[in-house]
C-alpha cells in the first residue's frame, strides 16, 4: 500500500500528510516507514468503510505496543526503585499504563486530531472516546518500535512519560513508608522514627509537616493534609535521598 492510497483524494491526502509531518516535527520523532505511522492512527471503522482499499487498522500494532510499553516502563522502574518490592513495582506500572494515564498522554500530544475514523464512529464521538485514544497511544508505541527499535521508544518515553514518574504523578499507588522500611532493614541500619513537626490551618483544612529520622539523623520532611500523607511524603523524600546515595556507591 502506498502512502498516497491511504487517503481518498489529493486534497485530503496533502492535508493529512501535512498533519503527520507537523506531528513528527512537534514530538521530534521521524518515521522511516511512514506507513506504520499512518496505520497506528487508523481505526478499524475507517478500514471497514473502505473495504476495497488495502488499508490496515491499528489493532495488531496496539497488541505489540502494549507489550513494548510494559517492557520499557518495567525497565525504568526496576532501575529507578532498587528497594521496591515486586508487588509495588507491579502496582506502579499498572497505574502508568492504565487507560486513564494513556488517555491523558494522548490528549497531551493531540493524538485524537490525527485518528482516521469511519463516518459512523466520528458521528458518535469516537475521536474523544477514552478506550480509542489509549489504543492509539499503544499502537503508536508499537509502530515506533517496528520502525526504529527499542532505543527510540525509550527516548520518546524519556521525554513524555518518565518525567511524570519522577515528579510523582503516580505516587498515589505507592507505599513509601513500607519501601523505606524495607530499604533500611535490608542494610541493617536500625529503626525509623516518624514525628509530626507542625500542624496548621482550620480543622476542615489542616496541613501537617512530618519528619522521618534514623538514629537521630533527619532523613526527610514531608507535608500533607493528614498525618499519614505527611509521613508518606517524608518517607518519599528520604527514600529518594538514600537511593541516590546507594547508586553512587
From Swiss-Prot:
<feature type="active site">
    <location>
        <position position="138"/>
    </location>
</feature>
<dbReference type="InterPro" id="IPR014720">
    <property type="entry name" value="dsRBD_dom"/>
</dbReference>
<keyword id="KW-0378">Hydrolase</keyword>
<feature type="binding site">
    <location>
        <position position="138"/>
    </location>
    <ligand>
        <name>Mg(2+)</name>
    </ligand>
</feature>
<keyword id="KW-0698">rRNA processing</keyword>
<keyword id="KW-0479">Metal-binding</keyword>
<keyword id="KW-0540">Nuclease</keyword>
<dbReference type="Pfam" id="PF14622">
    <property type="entry name" value="Ribonucleas_3_3"/>
</dbReference>
<keyword id="KW-0819">tRNA processing</keyword>
<dbReference type="GO" id="GO:0010468">
    <property type="term" value="P:regulation of gene expression"/>
</dbReference>
<comment type="function">
    <text>Digests double-stranded RNA. Involved in the processing of primary rRNA transcript to yield the immediate precursors to the large and small rRNAs (23S and 16S). Processes some mRNAs, and tRNAs when they are encoded in the rRNA operon. Processes pre-crRNA and tracrRNA of type II CRISPR loci if present in the organism.</text>
</comment>
<dbReference type="InterPro" id="IPR000999">
    <property type="entry name" value="RNase_III_dom"/>
</dbReference>
<keyword id="KW-0507">mRNA processing</keyword>
<dbReference type="InterPro" id="IPR011907">
    <property type="entry name" value="RNase_III"/>
</dbReference>
<keyword id="KW-0963">Cytoplasm</keyword>
<dbReference type="GO" id="GO:0008033">
    <property type="term" value="P:tRNA processing"/>
</dbReference>
<dbReference type="GO" id="GO:0006364">
    <property type="term" value="P:rRNA processing"/>
</dbReference>
<feature type="active site">
    <location>
        <position position="66"/>
    </location>
</feature>
<keyword id="KW-0699">rRNA-binding</keyword>
<keyword id="KW-0460">Magnesium</keyword>
<dbReference type="GO" id="GO:0004525">
    <property type="term" value="F:ribonuclease III activity"/>
</dbReference>
<dbReference type="GO" id="GO:0006397">
    <property type="term" value="P:mRNA processing"/>
</dbReference>
<dbReference type="Pfam" id="PF00035">
    <property type="entry name" value="dsrm"/>
</dbReference>
<keyword id="KW-0694">RNA-binding</keyword>
<dbReference type="GO" id="GO:0019843">
    <property type="term" value="F:rRNA binding"/>
</dbReference>
<comment type="similarity">
    <text>Belongs to the ribonuclease III family.</text>
</comment>
<feature type="domain" description="RNase III">
    <location>
        <begin position="20"/>
        <end position="149"/>
    </location>
</feature>
<feature type="binding site">
    <location>
        <position position="135"/>
    </location>
    <ligand>
        <name>Mg(2+)</name>
    </ligand>
</feature>
<feature type="binding site">
    <location>
        <position position="62"/>
    </location>
    <ligand>
        <name>Mg(2+)</name>
    </ligand>
</feature>
<dbReference type="GO" id="GO:0046872">
    <property type="term" value="F:metal ion binding"/>
</dbReference>
<comment type="subunit">
    <text>Homodimer.</text>
</comment>
<dbReference type="GO" id="GO:0005737">
    <property type="term" value="C:cytoplasm"/>
</dbReference>
<feature type="domain" description="DRBM">
    <location>
        <begin position="175"/>
        <end position="244"/>
    </location>
</feature>
<protein>
    <recommendedName>
        <fullName>Ribonuclease 3</fullName>
        <ecNumber>3.1.26.3</ecNumber>
    </recommendedName>
</protein>
<keyword id="KW-0255">Endonuclease</keyword>
<feature type="region of interest" description="Disordered">
    <location>
        <begin position="223"/>
        <end position="249"/>
    </location>
</feature>
<dbReference type="InterPro" id="IPR036389">
    <property type="entry name" value="RNase_III_sf"/>
</dbReference>
<dbReference type="GO" id="GO:0003725">
    <property type="term" value="F:double-stranded RNA binding"/>
</dbReference>
Amino acid at each position: 500500500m502506498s502512502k498516497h492510497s491511504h487517503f481518498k483524494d489529493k486534497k485530503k491526502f496533502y492535508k493529512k500528510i501535512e498533519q503527520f509531518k507537523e506531528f513528527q516535527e512537534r514530538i521530534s520523532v521521524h518515521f522511516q516507514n511512514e506507513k506504520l505511522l499512518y496505520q497506528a492512527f487508523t481505526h478499524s471503522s475507517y478500514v471497514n468503510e473502505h473495504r476495497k482499499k488495502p488499508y490496515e487498522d491499528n489493532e495488531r500494532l496496539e497488541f505489540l505496543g502494549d507489550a513494548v510499553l510494559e517492557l520499557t516502563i518495567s525497565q525504568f522502574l526496576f532501575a529507578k526503585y532498587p528497594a521496591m518490592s515486586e508487588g509495588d513495582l507491579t502496582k506502579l506500572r499498572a497505574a502508568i499504563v492504565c487507560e486513564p494515564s494513556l488517555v491523558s498522554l494522548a490528549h497531551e500530544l493531540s493524538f485524537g486530531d490525527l485518528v482516521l475514523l469511519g463516518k459512523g464512529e466520528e458521528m458518535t464521538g469516537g475521536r474523544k472516546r477514552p478506550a480509542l485514544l489509549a489504543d492509539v497511544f499503544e499502537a503508536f508505541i508499537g509502530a515506533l518500535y517496528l520502525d526504529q527499535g527499542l532505543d527510540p521508544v525509550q527516548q520518546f518515553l524519556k521525554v513524555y512519560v518518565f518525567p511524570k514518574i519522577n515528579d510523582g504523578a503516580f505516587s498515589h499507588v505507592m507505599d513509601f513508608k513500607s519501601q523505606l522500611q524495607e530499604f533500611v532493614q535490608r542494610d541493617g541500619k536500625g529503626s525509623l522514627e516518624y514525628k509530626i513537626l507542625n500542624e496548621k490551618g482550620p480543622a476542615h483544612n489542616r496541613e501537617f509537616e512530618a519528619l522521618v529520622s534514623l538514629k537521630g539523623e533527619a532523613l526527610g520532611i514531608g507535608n500533607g493534609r493528614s498525618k499519614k500523607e505527611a509521613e508518606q511524603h517524608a518517607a518519599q523524600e528520604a527514600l529518594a535521598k538514600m537511593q541516590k546515595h546507594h547508586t553512587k556507591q
